[in-house]
Amino acid sequence: MRHGHPPTDIHHGINQGEPMDDNVLRVGIGGPVGSGKTALIEALVPVLIERGHRPAVITNDIYTQEDAQHVRRTLAGVLEPERVVGVETGACPHTAVRDDPTMNLAAGAEMLERFPDTDTLLYESGGDNLTLTFSPALVDLFLFVLDTAEGEKMPRKRGPGITESDLLVINKIDIAQYVRTDIGIMEADAHRVRDDRPVVLTDCLTGVGIDDIALYLESRRKVLI
């Protein structure tokens, strides 16, 4: 039986509807512009496939298919290009994944109809601010991606994306020293404002931390699916 997120408060933008009762884990991936959401997907998909999963990807951009095209190019030979679909939202990113996820729900349903073997559906939001969350009608859980270039102060700014996401990802740890970010402080503050809910440090370009994310998703799959 699927559980997903419980009914949520104003920060989530309450959305009607129950998640579908199937064996697909639906994962939202949000975060600011340039934090590495697309890079995370491109690093995570091969690991999921290697671990026996059958992922598909739905990206969100306001006006273009840029992220979907990038994912297809990067994962050529790894993931069938038809398993990557871009949604042009024409609106603020949080609208399409939280307030009115109709377009994404339709894209997901079409993807599952076309590829019924899919067991993991990744929804990438367009870049947004710290208030971004996902509708429980759309996803079972969501990840929020920060990066060290934004500064070690970011976790202390809180916001629902940081405090309420199921998993917080701190990306680009490889450049922390060059942008004068103390990873230790950033990670400690993240744990503190999240009441010790999980935080993963990643370098998506080299794969550091990606196995930890895959293991986390598998652990949640056992509970949610």
UniProtKB/Swiss-Prot annotation:
GO molecular function: GTP binding; GTPase activity; nickel cation binding
InterPro entries in UniProt: CobW/HypB/UreG_nucleotide-bd, P-loop_NTPase, UreG
Subcellular location as annotated: Cytoplasm
An annotated GO cellular component: cytoplasm
Residues the record lists as binding GTP: 31-38
Keywords, ordered alphabetically: Chaperone, Cytoplasm, GTP-binding, Nickel insertion, Nucleotide-binding
Pfam families according to UniProt: cobW
GO process annotations (BP): urea catabolic process
Similarity comment: Belongs to the SIMIBI class G3E GTPase family. UreG subfamily.
Self-association and partners: Homodimer. UreD, UreF and UreG form a complex that acts as a GTP-hydrolysis-dependent molecular chaperone, activating the urease apoprotein by helping to assemble the nickel containing metallocenter of UreC. The UreE protein probably delivers the nickel.
NCBIfam families, A to Z: ureG
Stated role: Facilitates the functional incorporation of the urease nickel metallocenter. This process requires GTP hydrolysis, probably effectuated by UreG.
Protein name in the entry: Urease accessory protein UreG 2
Organism: Streptomyces griseus subsp. griseus (strain JCM 4626 / CBS 651.72 / NBRC 13350 / KCC S-0626 / ISP 5235)
Gene: ureG2
